[in-house]
Amino acid sequence: MRANGQASKDRELLTSMATVAYVLSREGKEYNRLLAEQFQRWERVDMEKIAATAAMPPEHLLFYKAVAQTLGWLQQIPIAKERKENDLTYRLSPVPVIYLQVLLEARGGVTQGVARRLEKLLGEAHEATRGKGPRRLLAVVAGLQTWAAVELPEVGRGGALDLEETQRVALNACGRARWTALAPLKMYALCQGADFGTPRAILPPMGSAVSRGIERLFGFALGESESDYRLSRGLHLKLADLAHTSIWDINSGLYRLGGGS
């Protein structure tokens, strides 16, 4: 009798968690759609004015744009939800473009001081970047330094980067799991489309909003230790499996649940 009662409770819990996973997936999927739409604004940027990229594999350049875009998220500026071509909120912010320029210059050996170069370019573009500069400059610099040191893997037969190998070299470069090393993997995967397969070994980025979302659901907070990231990955995978969705939809759903805008 007790076994039947426990089995019934287990089914109820699983049903409840599946419902939660579905809601997170729905919220996250819509948010990710907006992120992918925002990323398309890079098509308006004249790359020849930024750095010499002719010899760079297009997929590598695409990934570096994802790095710059995600570092731009540290500005904490809400993404535009309406497609207005003449609205400044719809155009690509000049700040991620500056991030990309500094990153490419650092990789090419043009500049040795990432922080000084970044501050110089932001200062030169003062009017355009007023109110849009990075609120977490040290985190931005750390992210730029990490990706300047990383040698991206060769493009695979499918025409895309191996996310698992890219994660490995990024974590080796920065020494441990960091948001600035993991968030670009998410943006790159999103711009590849819904059919892009994400390996289960990938660690979803976990900033303060995602951590708050996890705390609201499960009652405990996570930091950025390796064990916390692995626990977070397990939760993401379980919720994604329940909702038949990607970890990126769950990740953005948790971000929204935690108050991210």
Show which residues each predicted segment covers:
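HhH-family (HhH-GPD) DNA N-glycosylase catalytic core used in base-excision repair
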Residues: 1-261
